[in-house]
From Swiss-Prot:
Primary location group: endoplasmic reticulum
Top-rank taxon: Eukaryota
Membrane-spanning segments: 493-509
UniProt GO cellular component terms: endoplasmic reticulum membrane
PANTHER family xref list: EG:EG0003.4 PROTEIN-RELATED, UDP-GLUCURONOSYLTRANSFERASE 2B4
Catalytic activity: glucuronate acceptor + UDP-alpha-D-glucuronate = acceptor beta-D-glucuronoside + UDP + H(+); 17alpha-estradiol + UDP-alpha-D-glucuronate = 17alpha-estradiol 17-O-(beta-D-glucuronate) + UDP + H(+); 16alpha,17alpha-estriol + UDP-alpha-D-glucuronate = 16alpha,17alpha-estriol 17-O-(beta-D-glucuronate) + UDP + H(+)
Sugar-bearing residue positions: N315
Bilayer topology: Single-pass membrane protein
Name of the protein in question: UDP-glucuronosyltransferase 2B4
GO biological process: estrogen metabolic process; xenobiotic metabolic process
Enzyme category, top tier: transferase
Localisation per UniProt entry: Endoplasmic reticulum membrane
Free-text function comment from the UniProt entry: UDP-glucuronosyltransferase (UGT) that catalyzes phase II biotransformation reactions in which lipophilic substrates are conjugated with glucuronic acid to increase the metabolite's water solubility, thereby facilitating excretion into either the urine or bile. Essential for the elimination and detoxification of drugs, xenobiotics and endogenous compounds. Catalyzes the glucuronidation of the endogenous estrogen hormones such as estradiol and estriol.
Length: 528
């Protein structure tokens, strides 16, 4: 009997091992807003597969409440800011970025860098609060986590993994100029055919556009810095007790989960430890709330238009709101507008305002004809998933670039949010709704997205489990990470070969000169 029980317990353990990646323990360094939405989708799936997931959350976290019921565990660390103060700072920085004039390239990106550094100063204080919290660090050490999951644009996840001596996996949408992807991930982005992110170019560039792209590349390479590297390098060196850099620590990532895919991104080279998981949060539409469904059905054959500027922009100016409402009032479609502000005076009877909308469910509704979007990656992927053409009104960050990608693929029309007129918006809506080519292109992208051997979410979870099972994935990291910059570009080899060629040429020249001198001397002797 005891043998049978032993066998049964062994089978249960083996079942746990194979079905849920050894039932591992995952520590998460989270992000806010839409970044959290993507991470949480992965975390929920990990929990479903039997893993224990712990989120390291600050007491000022905005996007999640550690006290609400959840299948996730939260380890809360105290910070000097309150949730309200932190949220106000974020909103002010976002508002400032969204309203930046693009008069000159240099001025715009200098101010963007300043905004990013301001946020990173706050983040670095949070990080210092963690490492100085001996009780918390001891608890994390004793928890024996198997892997750290972090977003690469929010530093510290990699330092946490280094301190706990465990592997780590990155989730990343993009970094300005692909700086993180290139310097820490080792990815290649040839400027001749890959437009640098935030350039708003496509992969079909003219000569002048390639010149522009090269200028962007050089600027991001030698001037623009996402992080104040001196401060981060000093902080990491102090914590680890040895000279190091943020970039060097980030380069130790085992797997990079890039929230992109070829339905969205232009083709470029990849590496073995980089996996595209764009649209992992997308899912089939669920039924709408009764009142909303009745409004949608009342649209008849004309259908509906969905309008949202995302979660980070709560409202807009009264003047802009009236411009938009005036255009929406002139279309035959019904409109569901996510809007948190005073009701515009020009609002038409065909338009309803909502503080929140089930965006994915609306985009998946058969009566949806178009999506007016600020160009956030999550919203665009939901539109791709359901095959909905877009009118893009980008505001900041990667949004102009995202809309440029969709425009290049024939699935969107782009407008300038700050300067567009009612006529501009009206014409754009008529174009994407009435021109069948936009719907066809959107459906083509949708078919590409759905035609994958493994779903993006399953790929993401597989690689996290893979890292836990194998205690890392160092065998997938290219040796380029171990080379200096001059070795990587083969400058030492090139210099050596040039020296060899120069030496050979010198020796041959010297020999020829000696032969010539000898012959000349011989001829002169015969004459004498």
């Amino acid at each position: 009997m005891s043998m049978k029980w032993t066998s049964a317990l062994l089978l249960i353990q083996l079942s746990c091992y194979f079905s849920s990646g050894s039932c591992g323990k995952v520590l998460v360094w989270p992000t806010e807003f839409s970044h959290w939405m993507n991470i949480k989708t992965i975390l929920d799936e990990l929990v479903q597969r039997g893993h224990e997931v712990t989120v390291l959350a600050s007491s000022a976290s905005i996007s999640f409440d550690p006290n609400s019921p959840s299948t996730l565990k939260f380890e809360v660390y105290p910070v000097s800011l309150t949730k309200t103060e932190f949220e106000d700072i974020i909103k002010q920085l976002v508002k400032r970025w969204a309203e930046l004039p693009k008069d000159t390239f240099w001025s715009y990106f200098s101010q963007v860098q300043e905004i990013m550094w301001t946020f990173n100063d706050i983040l670095r204080k949070f990080c210092k609060d963690i490492v100085s919290n001996k009780k918390l660090m001891k608890k994390l050490q004793e928890s024996r986590f198997d892997v750290v999951l972090a977003d690469a644009v929010f530093p510290f996840g990699e330092l946490l993994a280094e301190l706990l001596k465990i592997p780590f996996v990155y989730s990343l949408r993009f970094s300005p100029g692909y700086a993180i992807e290139k310097h820490s991930g080792g990815l290649l982005f040839p400027p001749s055919y890959v437009p640098v992110v935030m350039s708003e170019l496509s992969d079909q560039m003219t000569f002048i556009e390639r010149v522009k792209n090269m200028i962007y590349v050089l600027y991001f390479e030698f001037w623009f810095q996402i992080f104040d590297m001196k401060k981060w390098d000093q902080f990491y060196s102090e914590v680890l007790g040895r000279p190091t850099t943020l970039s060097e620590t980030m380069a130790k990532a085992d797997i990079w989960l890039i929230r992109n895919y070829w339905d969205f991104q232009f083709p470029h080279p990849l590496l073995p430890n980089v996996e595209f998981v764009g649209g992992l949060h997308c899912k089939p539409a669920k039924p709408l709330p009764k009142e909303m469904e009745e409004f949608v059905q009342s649209s008849g054959e004309n259908g509906v238009v969905v309008f949202s500027l995302g979660s980070m922009v709560s409202n807009t100016s009264e003047e802009r709101a009236n411009v938009i409402a005036s255009a929406l009032a002139k279309i035959p479609q019904k409109v569901l507008w996510r809007f948190d502000g005073n009701k515009p005076d020009t609002l038409g009877l065909n338009t309803r305002l909502y503080k929140w909308i089930p965006q994915n469910d609306l985009l998946g509704h058969p009566k949806t004809r178009a999506f007016i979007t600020h160009g956030g990656a999550n919203g665009i992927y939901e539109a791709i998933y359901h095959g909905i053409p877009m009118v893009g009104v980008p505001l900041f960050a990667d949004q102009p670039d995202n809309i440029a990608h969709m425009k290049a693929k024939g699935a969107a029309v782009s407008l300038d949010f700050h300067t567009m007129s009612s006529t501009d918006l009206l014409n754009a809506l008529k174009t994407v709704i009435n021109d069948p080519l936009y719907k066809e292109n959107a459906m083509k992208l949708s078919r590409i997205h759905h035609d994958q051997p493994v779903k993006p979410l399953d790929r993401a979870v597989f690689w996290i489990e893979f890292v836990m099972r194998h205690k890392g994935a160092k065998h997938l990291r290219v040796a380029a990470h171990d080379l200096t910059w001059f070795q990587y570009h083969s400058l030492d080899v090139t210099g050596f070969l040039l020296a060899c060629v120069a030496t050979v040429i010198f020796i041959i020249t010297k020999c020829l000169f000696c032969v010539w001198k000898f012959v000349r001397t011989g001829k002169k002797g015969k004459r004498d």
